[in-house]
């Protein structure tokens, strides 16, 4: 299993968080996510959570959770594939809980579009689709979609549904399998 966030805790002293490295070039997710969007989201926003936590600046719980959630989000992305569908264990999991990938996407979209404001939408290990309305560390995440404006507004403006629809083209199902 991936070690999504690396930090050492000795007593109450937290030493450092590290930003996960991308396994793809910043322009590799185009046209689903632009290089500009990745530069801002990964290169500035995510890095800021890590840096603020490491410097003890601001709300440490918020910054740690923001770093954690982004460390779950970015590794699950890959170069776009129009025919991208779940494989292996993730396919079996989705079929067991939702009967089909299409049903899963419909249910995920329903939950995401029902989330008022910003947050995260994720598939949990118990088969439920859940939301996080602010930054919180969760230990049951299988697949996670960033639903904050910074994730979609640059490329999709007000088309949140289009952002989600296109996201299925860039999910790396091997990573999702590893989380099961």
How would you describe each model-predicted region?
Residues 2-180:
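Feature for soluble, non-membrane regions of globular proteins
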């Amino acid at each position: 299993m991936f070690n999504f966030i690396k930090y050492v805790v000795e007593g109450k002293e937290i030493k450092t968080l590290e930003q996960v490295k991308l396994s793809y070039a910043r322009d590799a997710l185009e046209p689903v996510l632009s290089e500009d969007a990745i530069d801002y989201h990964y290169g500035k926003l995510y890095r800021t959570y890590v840096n603020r936590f490491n410097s003890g600046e601001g709300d440490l719980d918020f910054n740690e959770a923001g770093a954690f959630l982004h460390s779950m989000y970015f590794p699950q992305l890959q170069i776009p594939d129009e025919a991208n569908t779940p494989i292996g264990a993730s396919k079996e999991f989705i079929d067991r809980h939702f009967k089909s990938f299409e049903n899963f996407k419909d249910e995920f979209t329903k939950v995401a579009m029902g989330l008022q404001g910003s947050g995260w939408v994720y598939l949990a290990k118990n088969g439920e689709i859940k939301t996080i309305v602010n930054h919180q560390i969760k230990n049951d995440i299988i697949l996670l979609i960033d639903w904050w404006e910074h994730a979609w507004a640059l490329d999709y403006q007000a088309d949140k549904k289009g952002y989600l629809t296109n996201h299925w083209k860039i999910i790396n199902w091997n990573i999702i399998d590893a989380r099961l």
